[in-house]
Amino acid sequence: MSNTNINVQSSTPKKSLGSSQYSLAGSSSSNLNNINNNNNNNNNNNNNSTGQENSIDDSGSSSFVNFPASEWLSKAMHKHPDILELRERTRPITQVKSYSRNKRSSKTEASHSINDTMLLKLIMQYFHEENLTTSLKKIQEETKVQFTPNEVDKDSLENLLRIGIKDTNWFGPLEDIEDADPEVETYHSYISEDSLNENGLEGEGNLIEDRYDESQISRNPDGTIKAATFNRLLLWLIGNFNGPDVNEFKKIFFLTYPSFTTAEAILNKFTQIYQLFDNIESAQVICFIRFWIEQHPTDFNEKLLAILNNFIEHQVAASHAKQLRAVINLKIENYKEARKEIKDPPEPKVPKNIFSPTLTFDDIDEEEIARQLCCIDFALYELIKPSEFLIKGWTKPQYRNKAVNLLNMMRRFNDFTKWIAASILNEQNSKGRSKLLGRFLKISEHLRANNNFHSLMAIYGGINNTHVFRTKAIRKDLSRQQQETYAELEKLFASENSFRNYRIAYKDAKPPCIPFLGIHLRDLAFVDESNPDRINNLLNLNKRRVIWRVIVNTMRYQPIPYYFLKVHQISLFLTELKTESEQPQLTLDLSSHDTVLPSSPSSK
């Protein structure tokens, strides 16, 4: 994998503060001695050089050089490494910004603020977050250091990784940049979605000055917003909250904002507008926040709720505060209880040997297998959040921890597809393979009846796998009904006209329904790559409008679940898929923009 270096612009003029380079991992006594010697040498050099902080002239008096206020803290941290060390070590508690080297993921000025044990625990925290349980267990055995999941360690790990890692999954020190100051150069702020905030929107512009600046907004021929700055967009939305064309745009904004800013930044802007403008706009801010809570209650994690509650407690008028508290209690704390069952589930078809340790795939009824697959798949599908589609976690490894639910569903598809192909090939003879293929085709009929396109495509992909399809002898033993079922699968997932048949079937499906994510992710990748994020330095809102339509279409069936009873033994059997063969499998590619889809038989 090639590494991509991203130039991080300094917020202060580049000014060399010395040449010492301290390693996070190098906390041995010899290294500390070298660090102290380097500091002494640097201090001597600074005192003997012209134009430094101070110098002593022939008369014995001291002269001072005026530095910009933005450099005062940098100078203080350089002169007092003991204070810097304390600052770094208490950062997870104080939440202050971190003083770190530009573009150096493994180096900081506080050389001994992290010891070997802390470093090991951070590595273990990474293994834990990535579900690398085997590696985590092994490192504990080798080092004799026990690991307990800790949210503070998690925050520390994220902060350290964000220092140098942008568009790369390389965890070693990045190469030096010729024009980069080797010393502490800038002040980094790590907000919750720092890696997504590449547009620098949080401090963009002045709300009062931007209020009527038409140069910051561009419109389509029909009058809808085409592009705008962050400030101008928010002001337009609030000023036109009850307008006829704003209802859809509010939905677009709150579903796509993670692609260009953060929830904290939006709430911060709302508080500023509430304080700066008149009562009418203040009331509209409250309406906007209510709309946000009602439509996207899951956006409000503990951190954002704390900010919102502080805003309500100290700045909002009593009447407005009452409205917001009511909607918070109703929507955020009780939203999981809003879904109610509307019908009784069918009686499960349980085999007689359900509790037997020798339970096999052949013992389970095809319809019940399809039902349990629906339960398994929907449990993954309903957890996916809109923001997971926006950060492209399926194509960028460094964002995978932000798209956990989406990736879980993709991995489920990969594992199930591989299991199907390997199960057929593991049969000893052609007759056994044909029989198993027939069972999978029967299951696919029930999946299609229940609109589970996720597992349906996995079955089609598994039996259409190159190695399975080459064994044409297994197809000649299929019944006419089974061959017709296979032909229907081919037709449904044919790639002609951009998977037109699937799109029609998905559009017309009556809920409950589960989409095949591969096609929808391909749509998102196409929209993202073929449209710029900005037009003349304005946010491209036409692009967000198209992205919103794709995401809403993908998530449209989340509110309505399947009402099948879960049979634990069958569900466990279908979840813990085990194969004896490691045949090449069809996958939703987690590392590229293109989704791998089955080929038609005619292309083989």
From Swiss-Prot:
Single GO MF descriptor: guanyl-nucleotide exchange factor activity
Residue span(s) of domain Ras-GEF: 365-591
Protein name as annotated: Ras guanine nucleotide exchange factor H
Residues in N-terminal Ras-GEF domain copies: 221-335
Stated role: Promotes the exchange of Ras-bound GDP by GTP. Component of the Sca1 complex, a regulator of cell motility, chemotaxis and signal relay. The Sca1 complex is recruited to the plasma membrane in a chemoattractant- and F-actin-dependent manner and is enriched at the leading edge of chemotaxing cells where it regulates F-actin dynamics and signal relay by controlling the activation of rasC and the downstream target of rapamycin complex 2 (TORC2)-Akt/protein kinase B (PKB) pathway.
SUPFAM superfamilies: Ras GEF
Domain spans labelled LisH: 115-147
Organism of derivation: Dictyostelium discoideum
Polar residues bias spans: 1-26, 50-61
Phenotype of null mutants: Display directionality defects during chemotaxis as well as defects in random motility.
Biological processes per GO annotation: aggregation involved in sorocarp development; chemotaxis to cAMP; positive regulation of Ras protein signal transduction; Ras protein signal transduction
Keyword Cell membrane applies: yes
Subunit and interaction comment: Component of the Sca1 complex composed of at least gefA, gefH, scaA, phr, and the protein phosphatase 2A subunits pppA and pho2B. Interacts directly with gefA and phr.
Region (Disordered): 1-61
Compositional bias ranges of the Low complexity kind: 27-49
Location (main, coarse): membrane
Compartments where found: Cell membrane
Family annotation (Pfam families): RasGEF, RasGEF_N
